[in-house]
Swiss-Prot record:
Entry keyword set: Signal
PANTHER family (UniProt xref): 2-METHOXY-6-POLYPRENYL-1,4-BENZOQUINOL METHYLASE, MITOCHONDRIAL (PTHR43591:SF24), METHYLTRANSFERASE (PTHR43591)
Official protein name in the record: Uncharacterized protein Rv1405c
Listed InterPro entries: Methyltransf_11 (IPR013216), SAM-dependent_MTases_sf (IPR029063)
Signal peptide: 1-30
GO molecular function: methyltransferase activity; S-adenosylmethionine-dependent methyltransferase activity
Gene3D superfamilies associated with the record: Vaccinia Virus protein VP39
Organism superkingdom: Bacteria
Keyword Signal among record annotations: yes
Lineage of origin: Bacteria, Bacillati, Actinomycetota, Actinomycetes, Mycobacteriales
Length: 274
């Protein structure tokens, strides 16, 4: 008889999330519409030459690559090796040198106080255990170092889109907190707790000019975004449910699309480790 342990359950959940993020082409989405967030976080975190940087849940490198361009020493980590491979290819094309390591944001394979700056943009927010992930950000940052995070807000387009598809996603159990809670000031302040000081937050809008119609937004997410692909795969041949999710996503996109422009709200957070 096999007895499941918390560690085994964590490994199973990590494997499920790794497979989900490998669906579609999240790297394409990140590079086409989310790339402007990279320089924003790099500047806010004060990254520059010689700074030891850890990028957590780095994806295909939207933050890691701009950080490396400043002359910083960057280690780029992610749970999904396919995304790290994409980042490596981009780095080679740009003549940049980074270190890469597959890692779970909830159990980073690094020593305490190892980095000057620890960053994550639209990444750590998707770790299932928010508190464990926040604790890890703080743990691996040196005292006096900087923690910087960008997350989608609950109230913005992306947060509402995630809420819309959540009931259809088998990998998201009812007891898991919504990812976009990282976009609420009070919530993320509570996660970081007494481990940081000088915490600052600011809401911003990512301007997206990729789509002409709400249907185009729907199609883009349905074809490229892992969580959406997972939702439709779970629906399967149920035409009624598929049509209902189609309707919800198109109507949501229409609320945020005006003259070919969307604005996706995010929360930028910076703090100093005590």
């Amino acid at each position: 008889m096999t007895i499941d342990t918390p560690a085994r359950e964590d490994q199973t959940l990590a494997a499920t999330h790794r497979a989900m993020w490998a669906l579609g082409d999240y790297a394409l989405m990140a590079e086409e519409v989310m790339a402007p967030l990279g320089p924003i976080l790099v500047a806010a975190a004060g990254i520059g030459p010689g700074v030891r940087v850890l990028d957590v849940a780095a994806g295909s490198g939207n933050i890691s690559l701009p950080a490396a361009k400043t002359g910083a020493t960057v280690i780029s980590t992610d749970l999904t090796p396919e995304l790290l491979q994409r980042s490596q290819a981009r780095a080679a094309q740009q003549g940049l040198t980074l270190q890469y390591q597959e890692a779970n944001a909830q159990a980073l394979p690094f020593a305490d106080d190892e980095f000057d700056t620890v960053i994550s943009a639209i990444g750590v927010m998707f770790a299932p255990d928010h508190q464990a992930a926040a604790d890890e950000l703080v743990r691996v940052c040196r005292p006096g170092g900087t923690i910087g995070v960008i997350s989608w807000t609950c109230e913005g387009f992306f947060g509402r889109m995630l809420a819309t598809i959540r009931p259809y996603r088998p990998s998201v159990s009812a007891d898991l907190p919504p990812s976009a809670l990282w976009g609420r000031e009070a919530y993320v302040t509570g996660l970081l707790g007494d481990g940081v000081t000088g915490l600052k937050t600011a809401r911003g809008l990512l301007e997206v000019k990729r789509f002409d119609t709400a249907q185009a937004v729907h199609d883009y997410f349905k074809n490229n975004y892992g969580p959406t692909i997972e939702a439709y795969a779970h629906i399967g041949d149920n035409a009624v449910l598929a049509a209902e999710l189609d309707r919800q996503l198109v109507e949501l996109a229409a609320q945020y699309l005006s003259d070919g422009v969307m604005e996706w709200e995010y929360l930028l957070l910076t703090a100093e480790k005590r």
